[in-house]
């Protein structure tokens, strides 16, 4: 009798892409940081949108809106802490992702490496404009 994950049409797709994925043995945990960057970015976008629904940037009411988010919004404190810690986790994953590329010599693929460096500078400029300057 064969496994249901290999015979069921829907589970077969999931099995072939996640469980029995034909991947090289040199694929280590260092290669997960690209997908972790995607997860962190998704969390940042979602929590940022939900926080922006209640935040006011006026200098007279900005602090009051932050306390409103933490006290009155359902799980507002969780959104705020996920957004703050998600930014730190995003940069940790970003630097580890670039470090892995340096370690394995990915800079020899000049076109891909240059696009990655441009993305790195764009992310750093965006974060500087959005988090440091205000």
From Swiss-Prot:
Keywords: Electron transport, Heme, Iron, Membrane, Metal-binding, Mitochondrion, Mitochondrion inner membrane, Respiratory chain, Transmembrane, Transmembrane helix, Transport, Ubiquinone. One of its GO terms (molecular function) is metal ion binding. It is a multi-pass membrane protein. GO terms for biological process: mitochondrial electron transport, ubiquinol to cytochrome c. Gene3D superfamilies: Cytochrome Bc1 Complex, Chain C. It comes from the Eukaryota. It is found in: Mitochondrion inner membrane. Heme b b562 binds at residue 83. Its cofactor is heme b. Coiled coil: none annotated. Pfam families: Cytochrome_B (PF00033). GO terms for cellular component: mitochondrial inner membrane. InterPro entries: Cyt_b/b6_N, Cytb/b6-like_sf, Cytochrome_b_N_euk/bac, Di-haem_cyt_TM. Heme b b566 binds at residue 97. Component of the ubiquinol-cytochrome c reductase complex (complex III or cytochrome b-c1 complex) that is part of the mitochondrial respiratory chain. The b-c1 complex mediates electron transfer from ubiquinol to cytochrome c. Contributes to the generation of a proton gradient across the mitochondrial membrane that is then used for ATP synthesis. Heme 1 (or BL or b562) is low-potential and absorbs at about 562 nm, and heme 2 (or BH or b566) is high-potential and absorbs at about 566 nm. The cytochrome bc1 complex contains 11 subunits: 3 respiratory subunits (MT-CYB, CYC1 and UQCRFS1), 2 core proteins (UQCRC1 and UQCRC2) and 6 low-molecular weight proteins (UQCRH/QCR6, UQCRB/QCR7, UQCRQ/QCR8, UQCR10/QCR9, UQCR11/QCR10 and a cleavage product of UQCRFS1). This cytochrome bc1 complex then forms a dimer. This is Cytochrome b. The lineage of its organism: Eukaryota, Metazoa, Chordata, Craniata, Vertebrata. The gene is MT-CYB.
């Amino acid at each position: 009798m064969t496994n249901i994950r290999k015979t069921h049409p829907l589970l077969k797709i999931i099995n072939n892409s996640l469980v029995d994925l034909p991947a090289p043995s040199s694929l280590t945990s260092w290669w997960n940081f690209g997908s972790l960057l995607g997860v962190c970015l998704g969390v940042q976008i979602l929590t940022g949108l939900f926080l922006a629904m209640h935040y006011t940037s006026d200098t007279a009411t900005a602090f009051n809106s932050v306390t409103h988010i933490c006290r009155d919004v359902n799980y507002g404190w969780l959104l705020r802490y996920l957004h703050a810690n998600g930014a730190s986790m995003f940069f940790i994953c970003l630097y580890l992702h670039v470090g892995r590329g340096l370690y394995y010599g990915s800079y020899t693929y000049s076109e891909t490496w240059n696009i990655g460096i441009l993305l790195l500078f764009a992310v750093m400029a965006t974060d500087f404009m959005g988090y440091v300057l205000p």
